[in-house]
Amino acid sequence: MEEVGDPRLARCMQVLSVIGDLWTLAILMTLQASEMRFNELQRAIPRANAVTLTSRLRKLEDAGVVSRTVESRGKQSTVYALTPFGRRLLPIVDAVRAVALDLERSDEAPS
C-alpha cells in the first residue's frame, strides 16, 4: 500500500483496500442478511467463480471482516458470517450501493 503522511488517512485507505472490490462488496451485501455456507454464497453470487470467492473470503477472514466456521453435522461444511467489525462496514457498503443506484437512475457517469 502506498505510504501516506496522515495516519488517519492511512487507516481509511486500509479499510477501502479491504472492501473496495466488486466481489468483496457482493459478499458483504449477501452476508448482510444471514450467515451462509460456501455453496449458498456461490449460488447467491453466480458470476463469482469458486477460486475468486475463496480468495475474497480468505482476504475478508484475514482482515477480521468475516468469520469462518467448519461444521461437521453429517457432511462437513463451512459457514461464513460477518463479524462485528464486518457489520460496522455495512453502512459504507449501503452508501456505495445507494450512490450506484442514484448514478444508474440519473445516467451520470462518475468522473
Predicted regions and their residues:
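Conserved catalytic-core motifs of GNAT/GCN5-like acyltransferases
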Residues: 69-71
